[in-house]
Amino acid sequence: MKDTYYNMDCIAGAKAHIPDGVVDLVITDPPFAIEGDQLHRLYNRKEEHVVEGYVEVSRENYRDFSFRWMEQAKRVLKDTGCMYIVSGWTNLLDILLAIEHNGLEVINHIIWKYSFGVSTKNKFVTSHYHILYCKKSGCDVKFNPYCRFGAAEKDQEGSSMLYCDLEDVWVIGREYKKGRIRNKNELPVELLKKMILYSSEEGDLVCDFFLGSFSSAKVARSLGRYSTGFEINESAYLQQVGHISNIERGWMLAGLRSNEGNPHFNQRKRWTKEEMGSVVERYHNIKRTGVTDRQAYAILSQEFGRGYFSMMNIIKKSKSARSPY
């Protein structure tokens, strides 16, 4: 697997370049259907040092556009995969209708609370975005509850750090990179880290249909994942694509918090061939006792200190390797 990016429209690009069911996680921040010079008035997105050529979608076409790109996102997503869609309130209805139209299910409607909203005199200050955390209807998705905090970890007031991190209101500051060239719609590293850690594993494929500043791709690589995606703005694409290969894959993993209290105590460690072989051997021994695959994966998860879906993926890969088809 390798990181692959395309300077083209995401709908045509996905049809041409990404097969069905190969993506583990979609993270994307689609255009807001607001004229570029008006975006800062609603969401306090400052315009200095912004890459030229931001491509917007017209308000009249936004609903149809949302239906079509989300159809492709669902197609490329694995049944165990999920999707995070970042949206402002101005076109939230179109995004929700596109989710329903494409047979996706909202797991959580997350509120991302940021600081420094636009000062107003005649209305309340806008200081949040919506994040729709979705999956294919009827499917079970990857979720790593102990990827950031252990069950026993407490803050200075004695409250559970894990519980706080799992709440659906995320207070994460936006990044102001004074004097540095950036894209108009750039998500903060901490926000991306949280989504990627909770919903994927090392070696998984992350896709962004609107790469922009390539922030999702950069964080994915830094956390040991692979990434793909599309950026229609040639200036933004050329300005960012060359930087990806300079990022050491997985360098952020060493800086993660301790795994205290996590029953999946090996979750953050790299897989070895020996460990994978041991999992497969143990799986066959367990199956001889007459248990179901689901029960076998649960036993393996407990014994090897890895997530349920990690066990399932290892076994599926071993079966595929033995299959002549």
Q: Model segments located where?
A:
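Core catalytic lobe of class I
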Residues: 1-237, 299-301, 305-311, 319
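Conserved SAM-binding loop
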Residues: 240-241
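DNA major-groove recognition helix of helix-turn-helix
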Residues: 244, 315, 319
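Pro/Ala/Gly-rich low-complexity, hydrophilic intrinsically disordered segments
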Residues: 245-252
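Short, Lys/Arg-enriched N-terminal segment that forms or immediately precedes the first helix
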Residues: 260-268
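Short, charged amphipathic recognition helices of the HTH superfamily
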Residues: 286-302
